[in-house]
Amino acid sequence: MLQQFPMSAYIPVADVARARQFYEQKLGFKPGREVGGGGVTYQFADGTSCVMYPTPNAGTSRASQAFWQVDDVEREVAELRARGVKFEEYDMPGLKTKDGIATGGGAKAAWFKDTEGNIMAIVQSLTSPVAAKRKRPVANARRAR
């Protein structure tokens, strides 16, 4: 029933200006319309989107807030590191990263925190035929100017 409609995610932030600087300058997001309370929307591929909104509860989740499906985790990690994004390292039962990247369960993944303490991830499917066919936009077109 609901699967036929687009889905949007929320990104809770304590400081909208600081968070916007991170998402727009380091991750290359292009802002959409502003929403009440100083929030902002961002549009992504395939009709997906997110809304950044101010709240004192930002960064309190210990789980990933969102993830992006990419076609090459190593390339994305390298590009984001070059822009100043720091990736998390994990060493626990069932999850061990090497140079910020974990491999297992048919995927590669890397996690980073935004300025508000939210955990975000990038994931590359190693088995999905859709992921293999996806064409990535030219890197320079994605970068914030």
Task: State the predicted function of each range.
Residues 36-39, 60, 95, 105-106:
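Short acidic/glycine-enriched loop/turn segments that link adjacent beta-strands
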Residues 5, 38, 46-48, 62-64, ...:
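Residues that flank catalytic or metal-binding motifs in active/ligand-binding sites
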Residues 1-20, 63-66, 123-145:
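N-terminal beta-strand motif that seeds the catalytic metal site of vicinal oxygen chelate
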Residues 54-59, 126-128:
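A short, sequence-level motif marking secondary-structure junctions
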Residues 15-17, 66-119, 125-130, 144-145:
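Vicinal oxygen chelate
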Residues 10-49, 56, 75, 82:
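Core segments of cupin and vicinal oxygen chelate
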Residues 8-10, 41, 51, 65-67, ...:
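Short aromatic/hydrophobic contact patches that present stacked aromatics
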